[in-house]
């Protein structure tokens, strides 16, 4: 369907709709209308006048339940329309009646139907229940605990399992548990998991006669070596071309040609050589020393380019040699050790699988994995096995029943699911009936064990022509995106996709063909694609306090402007007024992370698009409304921000959007357990389960449920310093010991009761309050346990209750709640807690209240679901939650926002799959790929098996074996292919405008790397380069650099020529360099901004947001908290209390009420309580105030100044003392280089001196010239270097020691050392400074490793002080301490060498 709503089937779509009697694979590109084609095919099958089928004879398999519901709805709508056109057609009416019984479902729902129908074939109890995922996790962890406990018990003196656990390391057995579960889960994605486990084990049973070259991993190792050699050859060829160019360093040519010949020859032989010969030839690769390229005719740019490329090739090959260097005997020894580890691991997996099956069978439970495997058992004949899919009589029966099997999103199925579909579809030539739709470029669920190779195999095998048993049909037309978006997407992916990275060619068959047909509109978005590149570091001294215009920008693409940053982001904290005129103050750019600045950039761009600028208010452009069939102004709901992952990044964008007054929403699917309201209720449940848990108990007491202050908790702690906190609470309450209290009985003490006691509430102290408004059904406490006010003869009614009575009330309720937990179902207990405390209503009044309430209701729902588990109870529920958190699990936040609200959505790319938006912003493109799975102790691959590092816990050895390197190479290529497909999904969500944003460090250097693509022939980027990508920008920018509109990137790299690719796409490219925070501009006062998320921050509800609201001293508490909370209105950013409330009258903040006996505000005989409270708070001082003035870090030079006794008039720095005494540079008259600048230049030369050959005046002169050419030194700095002094040093005995051991010399070695603060500032109070450290940083000029220790040299270029050893002793002491700490070797000598006088001072300890 086009944008205008006209349904005009393309020839390819018609072919997919009408093709019959063949297995058909429809490769549908993004926006190709595959769902519409699938629905139309079904309708035409149902209404075919010659061969109609019934809905009950179709099997339609979708990827999600939502997709199945949509498919059912579309089919129903089409049938209703057909009935409306032909109301007398009984067959159509019957199909409508059959719709709800039709097999339109996910693969799991179909498997469940098979098991419910044919349960007797498996001796399966028909009353089985499918476990909730939470139950599955809990059962797996419980079973794993039991399996490991038995395994360790069988090895009291150690054994294979203990060895494996020790080799994996980590705290406890968490790493081993995770590994066993991961291997088990992976095996269950295969049709015959036991056969795969056996294959994995047997692959390590290698005899001495087995050639290494025959093992499955060796082919991958060869490919890895080949790619490395190809990359090195490419670098060398580029270096050779630079050297051979006019003005190039021609003297490099001999070396470059020789080195390239070595690599080329090895490339030709790598496929045929056995390992021993290949290893020897790799070890023989050698790079010699380049000749010096001098003279005015040598272009420094070409010289630097040639040298840099050659060094890249050298470093790459030397690293390869180091990784692979081992003989065949060593390889076989590694295989033997790996085999031992794998056999032990597989044994644990088998034991776990058997124990889990037994546990599930005992309770008549199955999980989703069981659904697939049990269904497969029903459908397989007894003689079936790996590679032999022989259908059972049930499978043959279903083949006859289903006239056609239609599969949506075929690229996302796994091997087990594919086997099930093959068994229920017809396989004979005349009656093939499997119809598969998908797009392998959108296969992004490998982490869920989807196998895109299944789609690719059929894609390559099936022909496009008609007549055969199998057929491939391509749907290339894109009905979603404007032509500009389509052209931009094609331009990028045509260059990047390859069989190596992406796993297919992006050729004419894969490219998009624009067919959206948007009507012309001058106000539509143009250009369709924008790119914003931001530098990750900010220049020192920049900030928001200066200019308010945009950061400096360098260049722009066609139609673009040279401008700087824009804004990003949004927030989580519910409602808040936009800051008029930036009242809250603009943050300093140096205080913002790169992600925060990128989020601000995105937010500012959104605000401009929707609201315009002061000069041009209103939306920047219009979008097409598909429902109204007309153009309309852009709104927030038209915009989505897509991120690779949202868990830690979406909150940053939410906050930035809030700063710009932009409503936004993010359904993160995580952060549930971090939500304050969930933490509070879980803490309460933990206390109910076991009150002797200090942290949960303190959390509950401090929470709004009780509302104690930090001072109250401290006073409680003092009541029983040596006991647990609950015992302290009991003693502080002066309460009798309840049945669940600990160890001993204690009568009320003077510290807990009586006037003037430590726990009394005195005027001026933090107000103590408990939730006095919760339902009070308890008997009053006995008179023999009076509160602290009783000793003074004062009553303790209502709001004037003291701490002890509040604690007694809490303890009484806690005992009742514990009794309730033993008698009632868990869900009822939680609901009773909500009802009694009023906490559910309370959080509803906080910012983000709807989300908070949704989270609490979700906890209640999950507790009730948990009750379905046979072994239920509060303890097990809490244990399940804890284990889930330990394994980094999350239940996902509850959804609290409708889809049609006018907000910007922030979501992950995975969640956006299948959706489309008028404006798509893909952000975070500079974020590195997450390849953590490639660096674990064990690698896991379907074909290559289980591959461990070489692990020897006893010897403390861990390193990669050859199979590990080969498997890691294969997994890396597969992971990169997945990331490329994810990027394709992101870019193809856009209908009318696509915006790309990313941040990288050292932008000019990165641009130079990206622009290397300009010197490559052909259109497709070499796979050896795309396989080296570290983030999406490493694909996007090398491709985009070749576009005529990308001048900004080429200018940044300093590249003027190269190979540009003419293309119809139009791009706007803006580069943001350093700079300042973009101006947020003036916001209209009173704007209320809602920004919510399926995530809550860690602020303490009711403390930071509305302190003590539950504890407010308002009279007349109701039975539930909700009735006692007075609503607070927000108007134009100001908080306004309701008329007549005591907040408005007394000016007291909510939740702060006078303690018992305080003077009322109307009492004029003395200071009011409020005045006392204000005075107390103003008089408070921070107990560790001296530490606030300490520096976080010091340099060794700073320390030298502190201890320099020869600087008359100076005194050691004191904390907080101002050290800025130099005049600003712009006020200084320029009198040539300063002594410090001359010293810096000299140190740079000493750092670059070639120590492998004699140091002469001539060699140093050549070095200085080269450093000037490379812009390391300016000519003025080079002229200031004293060559003669350096030559003198190297001619002296000390210099000769450096030259003699030049390979062991380390120069300009930076270090950081943590030093106790009291060591540097002895005058600090001991208590205040306890545990405080200061980071000392420095750079060691020269360190020489000799046989018996280190020789440390510190070069000096200034004057020689009267006593140099005393002047620099503290400085070299820290140098020595750092070296000995870092290298764990002694420093035997320290020398100060003054170059100006050629004087050597040996420093003694």
Curated annotation (Swiss-Prot):
Binding of ATP, residues: 28-35
Keywords assigned by UniProt, alphabetized: ATP-binding, DNA damage, DNA repair, DNA-binding, Exonuclease, Helicase, Hydrolase, Isomerase, Nuclease, Nucleotide-binding
Residue numbers spanned by region Disordered: 778-797, 1132-1165
Low complexity bias spans: 787-796
GO annotation terms (biological process): double-strand break repair via homologous recombination
InterPro entries linked: AddA, DNA_helicase_UvrD-like_C, DNA_helicase_UvrD/REP, P-loop_NTPase, PDDEXK-like_dom_sf, PDDEXK_AddAB-type, Restrct_endonuc-II-like, UvrD-like_ATP-bd
The UvrD-like helicase ATP-binding domain, residue ranges: 7-482
Cofactor requirement: Mg(2+)
CDD domains reported for this sequence: DEXQc_UvrD
GO CC, one annotated term: DNA helicase complex
An annotated Gene Ontology molecular function: ATP binding
SUPFAM superfamilies tied to this protein: P-loop containing nucleoside triphosphate hydrolases, Restriction endonuclease-like
Highest rank taxon of the organism: Bacteria
Pfam family, any one: PDDEXK_1
Function of the protein: The heterodimer acts as both an ATP-dependent DNA helicase and an ATP-dependent, dual-direction single-stranded exonuclease. Recognizes the chi site generating a DNA molecule suitable for the initiation of homologous recombination. The AddA nuclease domain is required for chi fragment generation; this subunit has the helicase and 3' -> 5' nuclease activities.
Protein name (record): ATP-dependent helicase/nuclease subunit A
Species of provenance: Moorella thermoacetica (strain ATCC 39073 / JCM 9320)
Source lineage: Bacteria, Bacillati, Bacillota, Clostridia, Moorellales
């Amino acid at each position: 369907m086009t944008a205008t709503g006209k349904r005009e089937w393309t020839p390819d779509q018609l072919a997919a709709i009408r093709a019959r009697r063949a297995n058909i694979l429809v490769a549908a590109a993004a926006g190709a209308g595959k769902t519409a084609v699938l629905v139309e095919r079904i309708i035409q099958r149902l209404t075919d006048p010659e061969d109609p089928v019934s809905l009950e004879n179709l099997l339609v398999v979708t990827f999600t339940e939502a997709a199945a519901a949509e498919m059912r709805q579309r089919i129903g709508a089409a049938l209703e329309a057909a009935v409306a056109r032909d109301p007398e057609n009984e067959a159509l009416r019957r199909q409508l009646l059959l719709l709800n019984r039709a097999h339109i479902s996910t693969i799991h729902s179909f498997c469940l139907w098979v098991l419910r129908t044919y349960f007797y074939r498996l001796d399966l109890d028909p009353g089985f229940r499918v476990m909730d995922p939470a139950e599955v996790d809990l059962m797996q962890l419980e079973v794993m605990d039991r399996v490991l406990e038995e395994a360790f018990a069988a090895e009291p003196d150690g054994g294979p399992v203990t060895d494996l656990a020790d080799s994996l390391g980590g705290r406890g057995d968490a790493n081993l548990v995770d590994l066993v579960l991961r291997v088990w889960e992976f095996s269950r994605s295969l049709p015959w998991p036991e056969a795969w486990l056996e294959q994995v084990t047997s692959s390590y049973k290698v005899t001495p006669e087995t050639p290494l070259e025959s093992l499955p991993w060796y082919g991958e190792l060869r490919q890895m070596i080949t790619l490395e050699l190809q990359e090195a050859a490419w670098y060398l060829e580029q270096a050779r071309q630079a050297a051979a160019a006019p003005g190039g360093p021609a003297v490099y040519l001999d070396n470059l040609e020789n080195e390239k010949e070595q690599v080329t020859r090895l490339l030709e032989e790598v496929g045929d050589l056995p390992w021993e010969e290949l290893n020897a030839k790799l070890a023989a690769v050698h790079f010699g020393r380049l000749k010096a390229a001098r003279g005015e005719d040598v272009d420094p740019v070409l010289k630097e380019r040639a040298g840099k490329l050659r060094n890249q090739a050298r470093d790459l090959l030397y690293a390869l040699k180091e990784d692979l260097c081992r003989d065949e005997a060593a390889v076989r020894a590694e295989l033997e050790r790996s085999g031992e580890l794998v056999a032990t691991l597989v044994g644990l997996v088998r034991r776990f699988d058997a124990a889990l099956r037994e546990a599930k069978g005992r309770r008549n439970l199955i999980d989703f994995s069981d659904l697939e495997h049990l269904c497969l058992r029903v459908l397989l004949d007894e003689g079936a096995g790996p590679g032999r899919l022989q259908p059972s009589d049930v499978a043959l029966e279903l083949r006859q029943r289903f006239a056609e099997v239609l599969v949506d999103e075929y690229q996302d199925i796994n091997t087990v699911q594919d086997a099930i579909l093959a068994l229920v579809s017809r396989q004979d030539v005349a009656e093939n009936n499997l119809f598969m739709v998908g797009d392998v470029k959108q296969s992004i669920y490998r982490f869920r064990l989807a196998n895109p190779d299944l789609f690719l195999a059929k894609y390559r095998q099936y022909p496009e022509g008609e007549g055969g048993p199998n057929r491939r049909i391509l749907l290339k037309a894109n009905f979603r995106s404007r032509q500009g978006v389509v052209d931009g997407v094609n331009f990028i992916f045509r260059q990047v996709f390859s069989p190596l990275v992406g796993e297919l060619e992006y050729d004419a068959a894969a490219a998009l063909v624009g067919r959206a047909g948007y009507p012309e509109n001058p106000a539509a978005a143009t250009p369709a694609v924008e790119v914003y590149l931001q530098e990750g570091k900010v220049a020192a001294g920049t900030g928001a306090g200066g200019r308010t215009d945009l950061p400096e920008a360098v260049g722009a693409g066609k139609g673009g402007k040279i401008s700087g940053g824009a804004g990003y982001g949004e927030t989580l904290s519910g409602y808040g007024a936009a800051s008029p005129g930036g009242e809250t103050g603009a943050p300093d750019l140096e205080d913002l992370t790169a992600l925060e600045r990128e989020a601000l950039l995105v937010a500012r761009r959104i605000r401009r698009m929707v609201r315009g600028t002061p000069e041009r208010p209103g939306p920047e452009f219009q979008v097409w409304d598909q429902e109204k069939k007309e153009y309309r102004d852009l709104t927030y709901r038209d915009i989505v921000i897509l991120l690779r992952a949202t868990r830690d990044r979406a909150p940053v964008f939410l906050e930035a959007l809030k700063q710009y007054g932009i409503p936004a929403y993010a359904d993160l699917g995580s952060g549930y357990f971090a939500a304050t309201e969930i933490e509070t209720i879980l803490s309460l449940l933990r206390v109910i389960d076991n009150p002797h848990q200090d942290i949960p108990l303190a959390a509950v007491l401090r929470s709004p449920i009780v509302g104690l202050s930090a001072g109250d908790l401290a006073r409680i702690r003092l009541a029983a310093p040596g006991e647990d906190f609950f015992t302290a609470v009991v003693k502080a309450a002066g309460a009798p010991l309840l049945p669940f209290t600990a160890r001993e009985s204690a009568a009320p003490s003077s510290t807990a009761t009586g006037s003037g006691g430590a726990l009394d509430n005195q005027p001026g102290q933090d107000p103590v309050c408990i939730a006095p408004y919760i339902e009070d059904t308890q008997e009053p406490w006995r008179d023999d346990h009076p509160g602290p006010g009783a000793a003074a003869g004062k009553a303790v009614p209502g709001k004037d209750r003291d701490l002890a009575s509040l604690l007694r009330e809490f303890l009484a309720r806690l005992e009742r709640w514990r009794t309730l937990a033993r008698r009632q179902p868990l869900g009822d207990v939680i609901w009773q807690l909500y009802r009694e405390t009023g906490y559910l209503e309370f959080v509803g009044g906080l910012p983000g209240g709807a989300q908070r309430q949704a989270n609490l209701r979700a906890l209640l729902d999950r507790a009730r679901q948990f009750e379905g588990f046979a072994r239920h109870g509060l303890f097990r529920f809490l244990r399940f939650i804890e284990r889930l958190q330990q394994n980094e699990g999350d239940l996902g936040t509850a959804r609290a926002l409708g889809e049609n609200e006018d907000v910007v959505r922030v979501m992950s790319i995975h969640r956006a799959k299948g959706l489309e938006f008028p404006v798509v912003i893909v952000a975070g493109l500079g974020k590195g790929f997450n390849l953590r799975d490639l660096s674990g102790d064990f690698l896991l691959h379907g074909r290559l098996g289980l591959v461990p590092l070489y692990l020897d816990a006893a010897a403390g050895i861990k390193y990669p074996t050859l199979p590990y390197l080969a498997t890691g190479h294969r997994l890396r290529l597969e992971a990169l292919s997945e990331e490329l497909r994810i990027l394709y999904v992101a870019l193809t969500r856009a209908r009318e405008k696509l915006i790309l944003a990313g941040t990288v460090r050292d932008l000019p250097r990165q641009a130079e790397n990206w622009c290397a693509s300009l010197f490559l022939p052909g259109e497709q980027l070499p796979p050896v380069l795309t396989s080296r990508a570290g983030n999406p920008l490493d694909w996007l920018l090398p491709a985009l650099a070749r576009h005529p509109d990308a001048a900004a990137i080429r200018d940044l790299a300093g590249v003027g020529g190269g190979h540009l690719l003419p293309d119809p796409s139009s791009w706007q490219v803006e580069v943001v360099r350093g700079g300042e925070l973009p101006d947020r501009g003036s916001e209209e006062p009173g704007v209320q901004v809602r920004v919510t998320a399926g995530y809550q921050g860690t602020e303490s509800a009711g403390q930071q947001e509305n302190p003590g609201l539950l504890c407010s001293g308002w009279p007349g508490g109701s039975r539930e908290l909700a009735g006692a909370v007075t609503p607070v209105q927000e108007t134009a950013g100001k908080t306004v209390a309701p008329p007549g409330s005591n907040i408005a009258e007394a000016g007291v903040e909510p939740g702060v009420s006078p303690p018992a006996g305080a003077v009322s505000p109307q009492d004029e005989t003395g200071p009011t309580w409020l005045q006392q409270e204000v005075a107390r708070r103003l008089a408070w001082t921070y107990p560790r105030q001296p530490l606030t003035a300490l520096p976080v870090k010091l340099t060794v030079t700073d320390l030298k100044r502190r201890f320099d006794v020869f600087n008359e008039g100076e005194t050691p720095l004191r904390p907080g003392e101002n050290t800025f005494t130099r005049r600003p540079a712009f006020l200084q008259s320029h009198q040539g280089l300063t002594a410090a600048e001359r010293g810096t230049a000299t140190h740079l030369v000493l750092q670059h001196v070639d120590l492998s050959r004699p140091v002469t005046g001539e060699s140093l002169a050549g070095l200085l010239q080269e450093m000037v050419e490379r812009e390391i030194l300016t000519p003025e700095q080079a002229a200031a270097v004293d060559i003669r002094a350096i030559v003198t040093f190297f001619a002296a005995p000390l210099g000769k020691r450096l030259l003699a051991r030049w390979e062991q010399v380390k120069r300009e070695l930076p270090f950081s050392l943590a030093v106790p603060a009291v060591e540097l500032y002895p005058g600090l109070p001991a208590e205040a400074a306890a545990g405080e450290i200061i980071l000392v940083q420095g750079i060691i000029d020269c360190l020489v490793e000799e046989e018996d220790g280190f020789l440390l040299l510190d070069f000096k270029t200034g004057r020689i002080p009267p006593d140099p050893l005393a002047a620099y002793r503290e400085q070299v002491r820290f140098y020595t301490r750092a070296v000995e700490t870092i290298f764990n070797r002694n420093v035997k000598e320290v020398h100060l060498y003054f170059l100006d006088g050629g004087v050597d001072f040996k420093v003694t300890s």
